[in-house]
């Protein structure tokens, strides 16, 4: 149950009954401090101002008609007109029982929408690098959350599998096949293959002529070129899949919807834009001038959709892409997890899409932009030599560092168990370090902080789960076979249950805002509340069996909530660390 939403509805009804205009926002929020209750209604002051009345007097009118029977034990007016709401122990205990009995932990499914999520999007014939990490793991966490809430989600891996560079790549692939008859080993180093192809193109005119010819042939459907192109795509995606699997990312080859997929749509779209009077000729190119965007001279900005040589641009592909996602995938929402530097480009493409009538305003097109991963020097994260860090190398180093850490802390574990723990902790650390940061900001990549067992980190959260689970293993009990009822008799118990009951609010916030850091923050706060509860409230050695059973239930619900929350982030838990 979303308690915040429930109270918000109740306060909204009371506002209207007290004389507020229909639809006035109740603005119910989680209270920042326990002294202000569990929730706070902040909408009274804004309504009172519009009505020209005293906020505290109006707040009292609202309280007089506010029906929170069976939900709140106390309500009070604070400051200039805030309403503080304290949940009752009986209500919280009842909600905790219901959540523990539900495999979804009380989280209701939402009305299903068709949602397309565009994320990861590496380029063909290039290895994934750290710049692909944020889109890949942020997108995947949001997708998992949306599916948990019951939505039909289409994963769209918009790989860069088209363009003039494929001429030189195909020409080089052909050269290698003729010389060695074997391709797979040469392509194991995709970056090297790409650099070699570019060097040949720049230095060997005969090779360059062949390469340019292959661009034309590929675009016209030549069988040999198509076969070579497919080989490049296949080899790239096999390598990418290794990274996805290591990171526990849910993308597969079936989710690939590359740039090439929209090729047949581009010419008809330009023709339609011309027919609608949106695209006009300018210096031989087809251009859409947008009043919404101005150039440095204050004139409408021109967006090229077809070059003078007949070639198309990324904007044209993005227009086709949005059109396809609405018309063929029946999208209600389309989420783009793309670097913040692409914002204007996307906005211009979507403006054209709306003007042309390809996607109605009822369909939400959302740019979930993200900042950059920076090194400790505050500059883009690079190798010591100043090069781009390969994602596979980053994951290898994470495993090496985690292995050393686990060796130091768990000398008595078997080699197999140490390896399993190290791999799980390493991948979790890389992901959580990123996911716990606000999506839109740049962040400093710091190995020491990532792998720390203190603070808002993956090792801390994984250990928090293990710690709770160990209560049951020590006692030889199953979390699913507990008896008795939840009874709240201590302030620490109440604080823990109140935080547990905010899980649905965190899930829904991630889904609506595309911000996984909200789940990380929630789980970290929950782990902190459990620590306070565990220190103050004896469980296994409690002499009162009813209290013991109740507290075991709270521990079980905590473990299940942490596990489910981390699962939505794509992070595995461990029963033993």
From Swiss-Prot:
It catalyses: tRNA(Arg) + L-arginine + ATP = L-arginyl-tRNA(Arg) + AMP + diphosphate. A motif ('HIGH' region) lies at residues 122-132. Keywords: Aminoacyl-tRNA synthetase, ATP-binding, Cytoplasm, Ligase, Nucleotide-binding, Protein biosynthesis. PROSITE patterns: AA_TRNA_LIGASE_I. It is found in: Cytoplasm. Signal peptide: none annotated. Its EC number is 6.1.1.19. GO terms for biological process: arginyl-tRNA aminoacylation. One of its GO terms (cellular component) is cytoplasm. It is an enzyme of class 6 (ligase). Its main location: cytoplasm. InterPro entries: aa-tRNA-synth_I_CS (IPR001412), Arg-tRNA-ligase (IPR001278), Arg-tRNA-synth_N (IPR005148), Arg-tRNA-synth_N_sf (IPR036695), ArgRS_core (IPR035684), DALR_anticod-bd (IPR008909), Rossmann-like_a/b/a_fold (IPR014729), tRNAsynth_Ia_anticodon-bd (IPR009080). GO terms for molecular function: arginine-tRNA ligase activity; ATP binding. Monomer. PANTHER family: ARGININE--TRNA LIGASE, CYTOPLASMIC, ARGINYL-TRNA SYNTHETASE. NCBIfam families: argS. Belongs to the class-I aminoacyl-tRNA synthetase family. This is Arginine--tRNA ligase. It comes from Aliivibrio fischeri (strain ATCC 700601 / ES114). The lineage of its organism: Bacteria, Pseudomonadati, Pseudomonadota, Gammaproteobacteria, Vibrionales. The gene is argS.
